[in-house]
Regions:
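Residues immediately within or flanking Cys/His clusters that coordinate Zn2+
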Residues: 28-31, 173
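Short cysteine-rich clusters marking metal-coordination/redox-active sites
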Residues: 34-37, 176-179
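Short coil/turn motifs at helix boundaries and re-entrant loops, enriched in small/polar
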Residues: 117-124, 212-219, 223
Length: 239
């Protein structure tokens, strides 16, 4: 089996470059007030920057972050489902469309905005030439505070695989049957469920903990071969 690595920001490199990105995605699903578990919530890590909602008649309903009763949330979700990847779970708070905001200073080849992974276009094209699977860059709408700014793209990282049950505490309740909320904190020693991991994509999010980004050995080797900056890698066990 291929080796898998937890991909995170290289804080030291980011600090050395000193650049910053601020923004939010153009559209999003509302949060949900669940009538079953009683929780009002919105998830993180589910972002589809290449999905365009501009043709929807109710486009404005996706422009403002807010909570809605679960029934209304589910109605709005169904309107975008055909535009999103077929396997996408689309929980409350899922974001769509370009990242809109500002950027300044110098950035590493890979740059992060919380759970959003950005990349310079030229670096992405060099990386794609080494043929890692499934890398897709999406346009951003970032205003730069300098002349001749670089072009930053956001990588669309879709959820695949899951954490193995052995690293999930036994007292964590199962996901809500209505809204899907899974009240799991990130395990200190994550283990990936080997049988669930994809074989046709080299960079993805963990399906049941989407703020974790995972890269395959092929992706990590390509990044190292090109000496691209901005990422750290920690190998994770599979079971």
């Amino acid at each position: 089996m291929s080796r898998f690595f937890w991909v995170r920001e290289d804080d030291d490199v980011a600090e050395q470059h000193g650049g910053e990105v601020h923004g939010a995605h153009k559209w999003k699903l509302p949060g949900a007030k669940c009538h079953t578990c009683g929780i009002t919530w919105s998830g993180a890590g589910h972002t589809y920057p290449c999905v365009d909602l501009s043709a929807l008649p109710e486009q404005q309903a996706y422009e403002r972050a807010r909570p809605e009763p679960f029934i209304e949330f589910a109605r709005l979700r169904e309107q975008v489902r055909s535009l999103a990847p077929a396997h996408a779970p689309l929980p409350p708070g899922t974001r769509f469309g370009p990242l809109v905001g500002t950027a300044s200073g110098n950035l590493a080849d890979f740059a992060w905005l919380i759970d959003v992974l950005l990349m310079h276009r030229d670096a992405l094209e060099r990386l794609q030439a080494l043929h890692p699977l499934g890398l897709r860059g999406c346009r951003t709408e970032l205003r730069w505070r300098k002349k001749n700014p670089p072009e930053l793209l956001e990588l669309q990282l879709e959820p695949h695989g899951r954490l193995h049950p052995d690293c999930i505490p036994s007292d964590v309740p199962p996901p809500c049957q209505t809204c899907g909320r899974f009240a799991l904190s990130r395990p200190q020693a994550p283990i990936l469920d080997g049988a669930s991991l994809p074989t046709d994509i080299d960079l993805f999010r963990v399906g049941n903990f989407a703020t974790m980004v995972i890269g395959t050995e092929r992706f990590v080797e390509a990044v190292h071969n090109l000496s691209l900056t901005g990422l750290t890698f920690r190998e994770l066990p599979t079971r």
